[in-house]
């Protein structure tokens, strides 16, 4: 569909975002986890979602591998496809936040420009960038999917951190040390959500 198609008109919803948030008892936001492969994004995001669920918070976790089984199954790993992957996820995350959910996303999302586009789509007041900062050497040592080994052997091209660029966030809302215990990182994130009045104390 062309961006300028005059026959496509936005249909307003009778139920507002505020009304949905009141029903859930908390704000709808997007928590965007970014970092190298093996940094711990999915692990920390999953642990945080579990902690929020136990507090009766409505959540959904969008994981980089999982969306490629459906929503983004037709995309590869070229620069263009990776950009489209993040665009699609950003659109879905924005809709879920409109529904009043706390949306957790775990994607390498190596380029600042793409993360900025998602932030603009979601809204600056509903987007929290979370940088899981783990040294490359530690990520390689973890290598849960064996991808670094393949990249070092030349079997994977344009792999982020090896021969593909990763642009670290310049001013994330929270900067996590990926070598800390997951429980410590979850505590830091819960504190952030309380300070932002996203969840109750």
UniProtKB/Swiss-Prot annotation:
The active site is at residue 109. It catalyses: adenosine 5'-phosphosulfate + ATP = 3'-phosphoadenylyl sulfate + ADP + H(+). Pathway: Sulfur metabolism; hydrogen sulfide biosynthesis; sulfite from sulfate: step 2/3. Its EC number is 2.7.1.25. Keywords: ATP-binding, Kinase, Nucleotide-binding, Phosphoprotein, Transferase. One of its GO terms (biological process) is hydrogen sulfide biosynthetic process. Signal peptide: none annotated. GO terms for molecular function: adenylylsulfate kinase activity; ATP binding. It is an enzyme of class 2 (transferase). Pfam families: APS_kinase. ATP binds at residues 35-42. Catalyzes the synthesis of activated sulfate. HAMAP family: Adenylyl_sulf_kinase. Belongs to the APS kinase family. PANTHER family: ADENYLYL-SULFATE KINASE 1, CHLOROPLASTIC, BIFUNCTIONAL 3'-PHOSPHOADENOSINE 5'-PHOSPHOSULFATE SYNTHASE. This is Adenylyl-sulfate kinase. It comes from Salmonella arizonae (strain ATCC BAA-731 / CDC346-86 / RSK2980). The gene is cysC.
């Amino acid at each position: 569909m062309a961006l300028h198609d005059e026959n496509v008109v936005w249909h307003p919803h009778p139920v507002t975002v505020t009304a949905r948030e009141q029903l859930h008892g908390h704000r709808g936001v997007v928590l965007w986890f970014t970092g190298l492969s093996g940094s711990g994004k999915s692990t920390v995001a999953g642990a945080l979602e579990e902690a929020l669920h136990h507090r009766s918070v409505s959540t959904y976790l969008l994981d980089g591998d999982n969306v490629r089984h459906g929503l983004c199954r037709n995309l590869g790993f070229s620069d263009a496809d990776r950009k489209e992957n993040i665009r699609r996820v950003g659109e879905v995350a924005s809709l879920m936040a409109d529904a009043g959910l706390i949306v957790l996303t775990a994607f390498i999302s190596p380029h600042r420009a793409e993360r900025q586009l998602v932030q603009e789509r979601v809204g600056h007041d509903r987007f929290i960038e979370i940088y899981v900062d783990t040294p490359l050497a530690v990520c390689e040592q973890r290598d849960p999917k064996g991808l670094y080994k393949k990249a070092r052997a030349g079997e994977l091209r344009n792999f982020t951190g090896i021969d593909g660029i990763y642009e670290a966030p310049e001013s994330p809302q929270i900067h996590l040390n990926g070598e800390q215990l997951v429980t410590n990182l979850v505590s830091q994130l819960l504190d952030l959500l309380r300070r932002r009045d996203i969840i109750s104390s």
